[in-house]
Amino acid sequence: DALLIMPNDKNTNIKESIENLSKKNNEKVQYHPNVYRPWGSFEILLTKKNYQVKKLIINPNQKISLQKHKHRSEHWVVVKGNASVTKNNKVYNLKKNYSIDIPKETKHRIENKEKTPLVIIEIQTGNKLLENDIIRFEDIYNRN
């Protein structure tokens, strides 16, 4: 679902307006700012040319897939809860105010082993910040 707000005198040009946004690669045409996944959700807080900021919420006893990205690096800051982060073959336990860098091409995963939601601020950097820039190695939700 989407909501488009524009002046009344322009309402006959809705299709054209969306096509113009698409031509400009405006992510608002492609992604809603709140996205739900089997493990929880994320909210896109800010998107610029070479960086993006998200708020991730990992539900209790859930984890994201073991994955890597070809085109982006990520920096995670725990703002609520405790995270178990896999980075390559090492596991890091991060509590509130702790952070970790995930360079591109690095296998990684976030897991919430707690009984309350885990909240992380994610800063992505790179030349291509696309949701489909993901190579999954393990996924308990059977996604490719």
Where are these regions (language model features)?
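Left-handed beta-helix
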Residues: A2-V77, N82-I100, H108-R109, K113, ...
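Glycine-rich GHKL/ HATPase_c ATP-binding element in histidine kinases
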Residues: L118
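Conserved double-stranded beta-helix
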Residues: I135, I140-N144
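C-terminal structural segments of small proteins and small subunits
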Residues: I121-L129
